[in-house]
A protein has these predicted regions:
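A beta-strand edge to alpha-helix "cap/lid" segment located at domain peripheries
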Residues: 1-24, 34-128
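Short glycine-dipeptide loop
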Residues: 31
């Protein structure tokens, strides 16, 4: 189900992530979108975003997103949410307890749906 309002992106992301559905996650991004998968890193384009999202999915945790802000101006929207990933396992075997406040930009498509253009999953954290 596509997002017909920008604020729907968070719920759709949470649903697809918790279902382990990388293709449903990818359907939320423009082909040339960018994702910040960790502070100081940038994944640009479909292949890089898919690989980054797969890393998070491989943690096998559950994610929750709480929308904090949506500012819509014309065909652009700025969004923020607080996300947390719990119940999974990091590659070293330690518990996966991750979370941050995001900074995201979405764009209205010609078909009336909204897709991510920029998804900074670590919007409130500086690069190391």
């Amino acid at each position: 189900m596509p997002a017909t309002e920008p604020e729907q992106l968070h719920g759709l992301f949470e649903q697809a992530f918790n279902a382990g559905d990388v293709e449903a996650l990818m359907a939320l991004y423009e082909p040339d979108a960018a994702l910040v998968p960790q502070p100081g890193a940038l994944a640009e384009g479909t292949a890089a975003i898919r690989a980054s999202l797969r890393w998070f999915l491989d943690r096998r945790g559950k994610i929750t997103l709480e929308t904090k802000l949506v500012v819509r101006v014309g065909d652009l929207a700025f969004l923020t949410n607080r996300w947390s990933l719990t119940g999974g396992t990091m590659p070293d075997g330690s518990p996966a307890e991750l979370g941050a406040n995001t900074a995201e930009v979405a764009r209205l498509q010609t078909d009336g749906t909204w897709l991510y253009v920029i998804d900074n999953a670590w919007g409130d954290q500086a690069a190391p």
